[in-house]
């Protein structure tokens, strides 16, 4: 009698798993159909390849605008690249966590590196040069 109970319990669990996996597969197929294409990406959660708003895993992955890579990041051209909130790219990106390499506003690992942080007359300069330039322009300004 005990073995019949275990057999029925096992069949019930298997049936429940079958139904839940079928529902999950259907929802996943609907989500993928909605997000693939040029706008809003494609792939996992708010991601996947594409042109605008990403690609990849969660809010990320490869693409042209706002995307690429893993979580909120990854490679791309604008606002993207790398791993978490960053990574390589051309504008506003690059690297690993909150930073990394790139051309504009990026570079390095955590918190930046490899970018221009101070501008003097339209070119990159050191912090000392920027401070000296600021001091000289502050002396020239008229006082009200």
UniProtKB/Swiss-Prot annotation:
Q: Does the keyword DNA-binding apply?
A: no
A GO cellular-component term linked to this record: membrane
Q: Where are the sequence repeats?
A: 37-42, 43-48, 50-55, 56-61, 63-68, 69-74, 76-81, 82-87, 89-94, 102-107, 108-113
Question: Domain of life, per the record?
Answer: Eukaryota
Q: Where are the annotated coiled coils located?
A: none
PANTHER family associated with the record: GLYCINE-RICH PROTEIN, NODULIN-24
Q: What is this protein called?
A: Glycine-rich protein HC1
């Amino acid at each position: 009698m005990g073995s019949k109970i275990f057999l029925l319990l096992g069949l019930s669990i298997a049936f429940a798993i079958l139904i839940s996996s079928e529902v999950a597969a259907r929802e996943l197929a609907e989500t993928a159909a909605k997000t693939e294409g040029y706008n809003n990406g494609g792939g996992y959660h708010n991601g996947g390849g594409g042109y605008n708003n990403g690609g990849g895993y969660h809010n990320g992955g490869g693409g042209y605008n706002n995307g690429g890579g893993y979580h909120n990041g990854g490679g791309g051209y604008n606002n993207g690249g790398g791993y978490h909130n960053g990574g390589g790219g051309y504008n506003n990106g690059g690297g690993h966590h909150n930073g990394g390499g790139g051309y504009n506003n990026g570079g390095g690992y955590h918190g930046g590196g490899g970018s221009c942080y101070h501008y003097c007359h339209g070119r990159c300069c050191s912090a000392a040069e920027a401070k000296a330039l600021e001091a000289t322009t502050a002396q020239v300004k008229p006082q009200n």
